[in-house]
Amino acid sequence: MKQLRLEPVVQVRGEINIPGSKSISNRALLLATLAKGTTTLTNLLDSDDIRHMLASLKQLGVEYRLSQNNTVCELTGLGGVISSDTAQTLFLGNAGTAMRPLCAALTLGRGEFTLTGEPRMEERPIGDLVDALKQLGANIVYLKNDGFPPLTINATGLNGGDVEIAGDLSSQFLTALLMVAPLAKGSVNIHVKGELVSKPYIDITLALMAQFGVQVINHDYARFEIPAGQQYVSPGKVLVEGDASSASYFLAAGAIKGGEVKVTGVGRLSIQGDVKFADVLEKMGADIEWGDDYIIARGAPLTAVDLDMNHIPDAAMTIATAALFAKGTTTIRNIYNWRIKETDRLAAMATELRKVGALVEEGHDYIQITPPVVLNTAEIDTYNDHRMAMCFSMMAFADCGITINDPDCTSKTFPDYFAQFASLKA
């Protein structure tokens, strides 16, 4: 197994242009596919999850051209639904942002589609989405365990009508349903059951749908009306914002050991909720400066926080390791959906934080972290989870440094993360 040793870093400074957002990249690729016209996507993320989406679209007959560095994609839309005369089997790795929306989109047309993935994907729930699609007439069969991939879709189109969907596990289910609703045979009325997690990710979805010319009436996130007879129309060009979750590591670095770290590609005008991570750093004591398309973090003594971070679940992971450098006990609450991500992130985070000496309480949907007087070096297991690897890079700011196991797992969203991280040394 590959290992990466991070030696202690005394101070950081620099500027990082953040790669494109995974969430925006895969949503925009699917909407461009369903749209009329040709769409040019710039600053597209070049990573495993996006490659799985692109490979599947190509297999389904979608035509596109990629630039040499894979960050500009010119895609010719189908002007409607995806259909296939032959049975198709699509392998989607561990890409939830490809599996969930494609599962929904493939019910719209005609054909037989089987969706598979890596072993971890078979442990990531999709039942809430499938239940909702079945209410609109979809024919979907599980091939192994009920509620989980792999699955086969026998597509004949989606009916309109009223549909209930659970919102308390993952916002990706609602996102997938929203994106396909305009192409159903009648108007769709979506009722959200339970607390809606990761609400800002729904805002990303709605903003992109509007960019492609579709209207959704949002009744305070409890009900969504999608009128029938709409069509996605390419806006011509779509600029993919930098990934705000990826920005969190560099902003935390600036807060802990700045110097001054500037991230570009996200800022005040971002449609991503994860930019609010910078507000949490500010609450902890960091000096934060906002521009329209940049954020600067400067170092200051950090103090612990006790916050509900349901709205920024991915970026909240970075607070867990930043807490090692804050005075007091940090509590991150309402984050049950960490458990159904690339790994059970609550269990994994608790295990690895204890290795470096932290006192950790792992609850059903919260984690509490008290840093030790002196941090220990350790070998950090990453669980094939890109965010675990990136979060624990913060341990480079301890006097002992850290060893990261399987550092290449960052290829899911940020293949050259550690090279960029190393560039910050003052």
Curated annotation (Swiss-Prot):
It comes from the Bacteria. GO terms for cellular component: cytoplasm. GO terms for biological process: amino acid biosynthetic process; aromatic amino acid family biosynthetic process; chorismate biosynthetic process. Phosphoenolpyruvate binds at residues 22, 96, 124, 172, 345, 387, 412. The keyword Nucleotidyltransferase does not apply. 3-phosphoshikimate binds at residues 22-23, 27, 170-172, 198, 314, 337, 341. It is found in: Cytoplasm. Pfam families: EPSP_synthase. The keyword Oxidoreductase does not apply. It catalyses: 3-phosphoshikimate + phosphoenolpyruvate = 5-O-(1-carboxyvinyl)-3-phosphoshikimate + phosphate. One of its GO terms (molecular function) is 3-phosphoshikimate 1-carboxyvinyltransferase activity. Pathway: Metabolic intermediate biosynthesis; chorismate biosynthesis; chorismate from D-erythrose 4-phosphate and phosphoenolpyruvate: step 6/7. It is an enzyme of class 2 (transferase). Gene3D superfamilies: Enolpyruvate transferase domain (3.65.10.10). Catalyzes the transfer of the enolpyruvyl moiety of phosphoenolpyruvate (PEP) to the 5-hydroxyl of shikimate-3-phosphate (S3P) to produce enolpyruvyl shikimate-3-phosphate and inorganic phosphate. This is 3-phosphoshikimate 1-carboxyvinyltransferase. The lineage of its organism: Bacteria, Pseudomonadati, Pseudomonadota, Gammaproteobacteria, Alteromonadales.
